[in-house]
């Protein structure tokens, strides 16, 4: 994320992290809002856990747990994917979204 786009990317990340998380081969898993498993020894994932914890501690983020999301780590990037399901009344039909965050740009984000 360069200096011209951080607010847009952070808004997308915050939007995604509002929802219940499902593991996708790598990453972490939420069960009723609590982290129950995570990768250790990886700076990108450790940084991600800090950001996730901060976002989920806000009342606004913790009140809407309608959607599933997966986070997959590729070579040099984090891929956030969520499926907007019918449990969320805002969406009449399921919708699939993906956000790609290069690890090198994700790590220096402010805490």
Swiss-Prot record:
Superkingdom field: Viruses
InterPro entries, per the entry: Rhabd_NV
Pfam families named in the record: Rhabdo_NV (PF02484)
Entry similarity comment: Belongs to the novirhabdovirus NV protein family.
Described purpose of this protein according to its UniProt entry: Plays an essential role for the viral pathogenicity.
Protein name: Non-virion protein
Lineage, broadest ranks: Viruses, Riboviria, Orthornavirae, Negarnaviricota, Haploviricotina
């Amino acid at each position: 994320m360069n200096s011209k786009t951080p607010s847009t990317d952070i808004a997308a990340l915050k939007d995604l992290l509002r929802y219940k998380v499902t593991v996708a081969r790598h990453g972490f898993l939420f069960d009723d809002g609590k982290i129950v498993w995570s990768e250790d020894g990886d700076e990108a994932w450790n940084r991600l856990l800090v950001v996730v914890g901060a976002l989920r501690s806000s009342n606004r983020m913790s009140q809407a747990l309608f959607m599933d999301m997966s986070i997959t780590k590729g070579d040099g990037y984090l891929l956030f994917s969520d499926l907007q399901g019918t449990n969320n009344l805002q969406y009449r039909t399921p919708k699939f979204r993906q956000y790609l965050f290069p690890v090198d740009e994700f790590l220096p984000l402010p805490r």
